[in-house]
């Protein structure tokens, strides 16, 4: 029999920690929990797959930061998009203005020159550089500041 998905309310910012604590309890007490999902884009909630709500209640009992199970089930279609991994460079186009948020160039503003979705990398040229040298950076090291304005 397939499990049902339930949303568990947790303390904002403690989603991953709470999921790990629940996982540890599930392993210790051999509870019938099939999956625990803590998507980074959803704050204050984690999703637990189990045969019924009672099992989830048992799993979160005594767990710090777990606030309770929401009534009802969560349809799989509502969380399916969290399971698809999108490259960090999706949505970027050549000419976009980005800020480097990690690595040795952190804080620098740059213009996107080229995008390699297969490697999840982006080639940029720094705005403030005296000599414009293209630099390849990991896609999750950049944050979009503004899109290229397309003229019609």
From Swiss-Prot:
InterPro entries: KOW, NGN-domain, NGN-like_dom, NGN_dom_sf, Rib_uL2_dom2, Ribosomal_uL24_CS, SPT5, Spt5_arc. GO terms for cellular component: ribosome. SMART domains: KOW (SM00739), NGN (SM00738). The keyword Thylakoid does not apply. Coiled coil: none annotated. Residues 94-124 form the KOW domain. Pfam families: KOW, Spt5-NGN. Keywords: Transcription, Transcription regulation. GO terms for biological process: regulation of DNA-templated transcription elongation; regulation of transcription by RNA polymerase II; transcription elongation-coupled chromatin remodeling. It comes from the Archaea. The keyword Chaperone does not apply. GO terms for molecular function: mRNA binding; structural constituent of ribosome; translation elongation factor activity. Belongs to the archaeal Spt5 family. Heterodimer composed of Spt4 and Spt5. Interacts with RNA polymerase (RNAP) independently of nucleic acids. Forms a homodimer in solution. Composed of only a NusG N-terminal (NGN) domain and a KOW domain, similar to bacterial NusG. The NGN domain is the effector domain of the complex that mediates the interaction with RNAP. The NGN domain closes the RNAP active center cleft to lock nucleic acids and render the elongation complex stable and processive. The KOW domain may interact with RNA and/or other factors. Stimulates transcription elongation. NCBIfam families: KOW_elon_Spt5 (TIGR00405). PANTHER family: SUPPRESSOR OF TY 5, TRANSCRIPTION ELONGATION FACTOR SPT5. This is Transcription elongation factor Spt5. It comes from Pyrococcus furiosus (strain ATCC 43587 / DSM 3638 / JCM 8422 / Vc1).
